[in-house]
Amino acid sequence: MKIIAKTDIGLVRATNEDTYTFIKKDEKNFMAFVCDGMGGHLGGSYASSKTCDMLNEAFEALDPTKPLKNIGVWLFETLQNINMFIYQESLEKENLRGMGTTVSGVVCLNGELYYAHIGDSRIYIYNEYELQQITVDHTYVNSLLLNGLITYKQSLKHPKKHVLTNALGIKKNVSVDIGQIKLKETENVLICSDGLHNMLDGKKLQKALNEPLVLEEKIEFIKDKALKNGGVDNITLILLEQK
């Protein structure tokens, strides 16, 4: 598995509140996460970067020779602990009040691959023929869409399109979507913030992912496509491609 990441401030925002992290110990033990902070420059940047730092610490502390009984439980407990830390910081420090962050990413331990998701960053599985979103956006507009109250076309222009219904650090407990991923040999993983998926719809994104480029050129190409389509938000993406 080859892992590469890229972040860009975009063309509109004054600061970049996105943060990414990845650690690869070996082919069977790795992690990768994207966090999109919110709550003003200082709060949003702090929430996303601190979350990534704490994920790094938790993953580095794992011993591959002592397999976890349940990776999903470890992910849930780790994110709950980080959530409580960010939440307490926001209560105690006035300049960080109201901060929070999305969290979307994957953890592979001894060849078992799991994902965790909070917010509206996304995880996709892709190959030459298909792009599949495996996460559900935790947004007000997506809840309307899932309940049949608006159409997909209406959701694209809805004034509350960016309102989150779930984020890390905004309350004592956080809901986390967790699941196992069983990749086929031809399948790869994309993790990205909404600054990418709002600029490139499914067809454009799939086309960009299948450009005949080496991984370093491909990630630059995708980022540039998002900038050319508006670049109205910070853009962050991680590609995990099987060799």
Regions found by a protein language model. Give the residues of each.
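PP2C/PPM-type serine/threonine phosphatase catalytic domain
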Residues: 1-243
